[in-house]
Structures are given as structure tokens and as C-alpha cells.
């Protein structure tokens, strides 16, 4: 693989795994408060990266969910996106305009917003209730980092929904 470095790759995966306890705490707090549905929102690559989580929820859960392109979410203004919704999105740079606009719109309707970013100090986090940062991530290893954290989020929502009996 071009540009592959064991050390960097391991750092990225370790940081993503290290975020899981904080992810679990955030999801537990959201579930305790109550929510109606999940929105998986992205732009370009981060939209594509949410596809496996979308499939996991579709095939293994009764949680109501939506899988949306960020710009379309803002344009369509779905009626199901409310103060009782949870929006999950990601942007390595935190400067993707469409993703920022989607998070801003979600906050305007009162939704809870979870974001995954490379750096906490970025425009996207202005509209986030929960921020999970991975400073070691880059475009070369973003997929693995996002997958780990997306699956941690999805699994915890599903666990709290009673879908993992053990």
C-alpha cells in the first residue's frame, strides 16, 4: 500500500479504540434522555463510510434511522428530523461546508449532534453536542478510524435498545 506506515496506522486505530469508552458514555446519556431516530449524515467519502453502519442498523435493529447526504438533508428539511433526533456525522478537516450546514440545521431543529473529526478546533464542532477527535487520522487511514467509531456508536445504540441480550 502506497505510503503505509505501521506506526501511524497503529496510532490511528489505537486512538479510535480509545474513544470507545467516551462514545459509550455519550450514547448512554442520549439514550437515558430519550431519542426518536438516528440520522447518518455525510458528504462524499464520509457519506460512503456511513453505509456499513446504515446496513448494520437496517438488518439488525428496530431503531428508526435515516441515511442522508448532508446537502440534501438541508435542502429537503425532513419532517422526521426533530429535537428528538440524533445526527451522526464526520469530517476529517471539520471544514466540509455541506456537513457544517447539515449540523447547523440539525441544531436549529434541536437535534442532538455527534461528530467525528480530526481536530476539535474546527467549524463543524460549533454545532456538536458530542465530539470525538482523532488527531492522528489522515485521508490515508480515515476509513478504518471512522468504521471503528461508527460501529461503536451503532452497537451501543443497539445494545441500549435491547438488541444484544448478553
Where are these regions (language model features)?
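Active-site phosphate/pyrophosphate-binding segments
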Residues: 2-36, 138-142, 153-166
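Glycine-rich phosphate-binding loops that contact phosphosugars or nucleotide phosphates
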Residues: 36-165
Amino acid at each position: 500500500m502506497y505510503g503505509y506506515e505501521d506506526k501511524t496506522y497503529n496510532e490511528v486505530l489505537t486512538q479510535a479504540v480509545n474513544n470507545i469508552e467516551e462514545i459509550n458514555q455519550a450514547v448512554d446519556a442520549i439514550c437515558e434522555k430519550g431519542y426518536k431516530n438516528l440520522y447518518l449524515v455525510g458528504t462524499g467519502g464520509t457519506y460512503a463510510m456511513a453505509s456499513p453502519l446504515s446496513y448494520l442498523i437496517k438488518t439488525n435493529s428496530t431503531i428508526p434511522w435515516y441515511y442522508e447526504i448532508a446537502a440534501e438533508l438541508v435542502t429537503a428539511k425532513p419532517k422526521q428530523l426533530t429535537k428528538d433526533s440524533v445526527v451522526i456525522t464526520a469530517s476529517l478537516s471539520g471544514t466540509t461546508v455541506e456537513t457544517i450546514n447539515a449540523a447547523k440545521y440539525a441544531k436549529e431543529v434541536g437535534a442532538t449532534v455527534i461528530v467525528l473529526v480530526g481536530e476539535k478546533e474546527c467549524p463543524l464542532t460549533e454545532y456538536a453536542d458530542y465530539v470525538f477527535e482523532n488527531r492522528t487520522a489522515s485521508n490515508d487511514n480515515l476509513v478504518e478510524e471512522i468504521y471503528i467509531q461508527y460501529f461503536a456508536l451503532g452497537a451501543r445504540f443497539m445494545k441500549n435498545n435491547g438488541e444484544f441480550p448478553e
